[in-house]
Amino acid sequence: MSYYQHPSAIVDDGAQIGSDSRVWHFVHICAGARIGAGVSLGQNVFVGNKVVIGDRCKIQNNVSVYDNVTLEEGVFCGPSMVFTNVYNPRSLIERKDQYRNTLVKKGATLGANCTIVCGVTIGEYAFVGAGAVINKNVPSYALMVGVPARQIGWMSEFGEQLQLNEQGEAVCSHSGARYVLNGKILSKVDV
């Protein structure tokens, strides 16, 4: 085993876990899960069967990653944030054949206690604020807050809010990376 597993964690036979990952207290990983290298799963995390977690993701305490969720590389899931997998659940109606796919792209941050309603895509390096409810697709680099969430700005890959000038350009104050807004799409400019 090339990853750390706390003695209280349960990893079902068949689960794939990459090297240098850390599986902490009371985690349960189901048999069909695929987890990349260098991943950290905090206390009381649940990972379903049809879940893919990319390299270097960090999932904080009390998060359940249900079936049909894919997290690309470097995604941060804050404490007690929530994924759903059925849009209109009912206790007395079986809807396991109606799970909707949720994709969280590279480098995105999902803040503490936010809710991601199933069937959405969250773009690269997007930033979902604490407690926000996401019920539609989120553009790359977008800063989303509120219930339901609305976009209030743009974030750099470094995780700093960008201040766009009149030409729709910005420079990250920490990394020096440049960004340009074309219509409703923000892109990082390679220098």
Curated annotation (Swiss-Prot):
Its EC number is 2.3.1.201. Keywords: Acyltransferase, Cell wall biogenesis/degradation, Lipopolysaccharide biosynthesis, Repeat, Transferase. One of its GO terms (biological process) is UDP-glucuronate biosynthetic process. It is an enzyme of class 2 (transferase). Pathway: Bacterial outer membrane biogenesis; LPS O-antigen biosynthesis. It catalyses: UDP-2-acetamido-3-amino-2,3-dideoxy-alpha-D-glucuronate + acetyl-CoA = UDP-2,3-diacetamido-2,3-dideoxy-alpha-D-glucuronate + CoA + H(+). Gene3D superfamilies: 2.20.70.110, Hexapeptide repeat proteins. Coiled coil: none annotated. Transmembrane segments: none annotated. One of its GO terms (molecular function) is acyltransferase activity. Disruption phenotype: Cells lacking this gene are incapable of producing either long-chain B-band O antigen (> or = 2 repeating units) or semi-rough LPS (lipid A-core + one O antigen repeat). Changing K136A: Reduction in catalytic activity. Plays a role in the biosynthesis of B-band O antigen for serotype O5. Belongs to the transferase hexapeptide repeat family. Homotrimer. This is UDP-2-acetamido-3-amino-2,3-dideoxy-D-glucuronate N-acetyltransferase.
